């Protein structure tokens, strides 16, 4: 350290000692003041003052200030469509704008509030009515309140004694969701995301087919094969890897031109599997595929599974919410025949992330698969019904409560409120589809989208009237990401894009936020034209 630094450090120590003597003389808290002196002495080797530990009142004010920030910047801010969906910065730019480094000494609360402001400044606002980038979004006030309560209480939902209200709300929500699926004697659990729900179901299938493997393991088993469609979520293959079956043994079933699994192709693969001496174990059918929003033919798939003794799982993470609507529940016709079903409430239902459920047709499945004797945690002589110690039947021990926020939302809205949300999202998607049909600069990827995924191309003037050959689609594939980047940088709109199979890159709109309206759908198309007409 140079002389100037030493003198500065000495001055700080001197000031700290004076403050210490004066404070003791006034009879204030000795321990806190002593801590302040220790921190001041440390400053001799640092470039700036290290703050003392904030008082309880100061910490309370910090929480209040941050909460007010949340209300102003997000809850109220996203109601104004002039608020940018995102103030996009690259990783390199963010490193220049924000100090991400962690240090030995803490920061002053004013600095922390400034950092919190920057989190709002540079985050994508998924609650904005013009956020269409992924299959989550919206901002539900009751869900946010439930999340806040959950974090403040900070309970672990494995036993009733430490999380009584949380476990009771979880049981209530699960029982209600089971009714919508049609599982009259089922059970379920909340999971950390839809991929985990799909994983748990695949693991349950093995234990259903080979219950002895709970203790003996998979050694000596024949080759186990799972199946999924070309449009299934990638977790179907990842879970095959994680469970030791291998991606080579996750067989992909062909889809029709609407993105639906072809049952005849599924059965062909099942017969081939058997001919090879392997065991057809598990199939993932999808309710609302990620890209095209397609619903597989569940009744036909269920018949094949029953015939060949295959566990049928429905990944309804995205499309399960159609069950909430009398008008659209037919999309899920036959899902009650499946052995398990995944449903993400943080998608169409707009619960705050994360809020995922997996449901099983047969009660007792989870206990048979996962329960162990854990006397330090799951005793049988407690002063309440230990069936509410849900952790005994799960793979996880530490588990956050994801049920309270959804329970509060359901209490506030009722079934009818969620039905209106789904119907509004469907109305928006159908309006957008009709506008695309009417405007010559747009073209639908599939003629009749059945859910709220609306896949389409924008055809700029430079490609109008040209032959749709390989070069045409190559140019089209490069134009769409450019338009997306322009909108992202201006902050006006976030919408995804993707290719699928042999279909070249297109825009993939996923509509779920019920605060969006027909004007927002028009804005999407107008904004794309505005940013792409010169390409």
Question: What residues fall within each predicted segment?
Answer:
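Active-site C-terminal subdomain of aminotransferase-like
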Residues: 289, 308, 333-440, 461-462
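N-terminal entrance/gating region of PLP-dependent enzymes' catalytic architecture
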Residues: 45-185, 485-495, 510-516, 523-528
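PLP-dependent enzyme catalytic core of the Aspartate aminotransferase-like
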Residues: 466-470, 499-535
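Conserved PLP-enzyme active-site core in the AAT-like
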Residues: 197-367
């Amino acid at each position: 350290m140079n002389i100037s630094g030493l003198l500065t450090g000495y001055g700080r120590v001197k000031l700290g000692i004076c403050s210490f003597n004066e404070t003791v003389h006034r009879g204030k808290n000795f321990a806190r003041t002593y801590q302040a002196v220790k921190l001041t002495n440390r400053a001799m080797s640092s470039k700036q003052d290290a703050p003392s530990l904030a008082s309880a009142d100061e910490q309370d004010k910090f929480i209040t200030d941050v909460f007010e920030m949340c209300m102003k910047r997000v809850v109220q801010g996203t109601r104004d469509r002039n608020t940018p969906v995102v103030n996009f910065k690259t990783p390199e730019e963010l490193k220049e704008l924000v100090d991400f480094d962690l240090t030995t000494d803490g920061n002053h609360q004013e600095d922390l509030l400034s950092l919190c402001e920057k989190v709002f400044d540079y985050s994508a606002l998924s609650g904005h009515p013009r956020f269409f980038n992924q299959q989550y979004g919206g901002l539900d006030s009751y869900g946010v309140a439930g999340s806040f309560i959950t974090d403040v209480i900070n309970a672990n939902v494995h036993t009733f004694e430490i999380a009584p209200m949380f476990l009771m709300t979880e049981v209530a929500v699960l029982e209600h969701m089971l009714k919508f699926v049609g599982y009259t004697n089922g059970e379920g659990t909340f999971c950390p995301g839809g991929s985990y729900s799909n994983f748990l179901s695949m693991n349950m299938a093995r234990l259903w087919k080979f219950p002895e493997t709970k203790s003996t393991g998979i050694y000596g088993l024949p080759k186990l094969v799972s199946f999924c469609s070309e449009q299934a979520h990638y977790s179907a293959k990842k879970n095959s890897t994680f469970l030791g079956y291998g991606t080579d043994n996750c067989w992909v079933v062909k889809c029709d031109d609407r993105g639906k699994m072809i049952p005849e192709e599924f059965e062909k693969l099942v017969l081939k599997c058997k001919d090879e001496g392997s065991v057809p174990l598990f199939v993932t059918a999808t309710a609302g595929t990620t890209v095209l929003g397609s619903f597989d033919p569940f009744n036909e798939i269920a018949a094949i599974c029953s015939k060949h003794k295959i566990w049928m799982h429905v990944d309804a993470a995205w499309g399960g919410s159609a069950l909430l609507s009398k008008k659209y529940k037919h999309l899920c016709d036959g899902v009650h025949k499946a052995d398990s079903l995944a449903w993400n409430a943080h998608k169409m239902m707009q619960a705050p992330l994360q809020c995922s459920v997996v449901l099983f047709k047969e009660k007792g499945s989870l206990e048979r698969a996962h329960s162990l004797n854990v006397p330090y945690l799951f005793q049988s002589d407690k002063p309440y019904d230990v069936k509410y110690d849900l952790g005994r039947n799960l793979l996880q021990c530490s588990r956050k409560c994801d049920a309270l926020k959804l329970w509060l939302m359901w209490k506030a809205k009722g079934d009818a409120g969620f039905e209106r949300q789904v119907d509004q999202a469907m109305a928006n998607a159908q309006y957008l589809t009709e506008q695309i049909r009417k405007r010559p600069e747009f073209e639908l990827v599939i003629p009749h989208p059945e859910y709220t995924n609306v896949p389409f191309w924008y055809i700029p003037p430079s490609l109008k009237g040209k032959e749709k050959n390989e070069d045409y689609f190559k140019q089209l594939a490069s134009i769409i990401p450019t338009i997306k980047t322009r909108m992202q940088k201006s902050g006006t709109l976030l919408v995804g894009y993707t290719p699928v199979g042999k279909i070249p890159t297109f825009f993939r709109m996923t509509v779920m936020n019920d605060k969006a309206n027909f004007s927002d759908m028009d804005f999407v198309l107008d904004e794309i034209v505005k940013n792409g007409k010169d390409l």
